[in-house]
């Protein structure tokens, strides 16, 4: 089963205003994340999420830049694919911790595809 496409969609989910009486910290007003979708040639679509601790634009850009490395590859080789991503980002002198946030959504989407194909819930 080959990967045909990867999409990253930035989202911001508004939170209810904080009820704290503290004037120092009111808390965040939204949860920001990037939803990752991985598509296959057999019609499966895996969904993952990565926290956008780097900001929505950078997280989305890292996910989208993984597309040339992953498209056409067998999505069952999750460990190999993730290793390729990490090697590529190390070669480009990017801090691997930075990229690992974005890669978590890709890996989760790949495991989601494998769970769907096996007819099992993802947690198993």
What are these regions (language model features)?
Residues 1-42, 51:
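Structured beta-strand/loop patches that form or line metal/cofactor-binding pockets in enzymes
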